[in-house]
Amino acid sequence: MRNSVAVLALAVALCPGLAQAQAGDNTVKKIEEYRQALVDGNPAELWEARGEDLWKRKRGPKQVSLEACDLGLGAGVIKGAYAVLPRYFADADRVMDLESRLVHCMMTLQGMSRADATRRPFGNGTERSDMEALVAFITAESKGVVMNVPQRHAKEREAYALGKQIFFFRGGPHDFSCATCHSEGGKRIRLQDLPNLTETKDAQRAYTSWPAYRVSQGELRSMQWRLFDCFRQQRFPALEFTSEASVALTMFLARNANGAPFAAPAIKR
């Protein structure tokens, strides 16, 4: 009798925990079902179409298009280009991600000033960003291509090492780092699961799903924006668009995603 009472007491004690776990699992399932329901009508296609027009349109003081821009696989080649970025570019003697390379091409091919090329890196809900549209178009051309970010050049390896250092650096008023939220499994902020970016599968799944259309914002968001917003949430100083730090952190994340097929532009809450 005593054993039966003890078992019953233990079951009662565990019930709240079991109920919470089941509720949590059900919430995750519902969120995933919601995301899948949105995939077939991803508004990112609108950004892709505008990006293609911007890629082919003659713009800037020189009135030329971006079709001769070398994104790493040769002038004008965009198929699969995002899957090998960031990388070292000899003509600039530095490592570049997609956005910094596009800025470079706008300046060298189209004759734009850096200020003009970077005037609106992110849309604000009212004014759309040309850069985000170009990113949508170019990244879509790598969908299904396996990530293969290189580390052959010394500067590529230096960028990866710097990105790793930034990922684990703690600072700001909350003594946060990227790793605070993204180095352990099972973490979540509100309804958002936080991937463990130190684990290969999570790192691959996370990186290959950006850029993405954010339903809550009505905007397509790039990886540069994702990093900028992470810094904002940590109360860090603003991450400068296409800065060495932003490219290095992108290199760290992209390289860790090697071996996975690219799957963006995606759609997120």
Please identify what each model-predicted range represents.
Residues 22-46, 56-133, 143-144, 169-269:
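Electron-transfer interface patches adjacent to heme c in soluble/periplasmic c-type cytochromes
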Residues 134-141, 150-151:
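Hydrophobic, well-structured mid-protein blocks that either form specific transmembrane helices
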Residues 36-52, 144-164:
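Short, charged low-complexity linear segments at domain edges
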Residues 6-16:
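Bacterial N-terminal signal peptides
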Residues 17-21:
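Sec/Tat signal peptide C-region and signal peptidase I cleavage site
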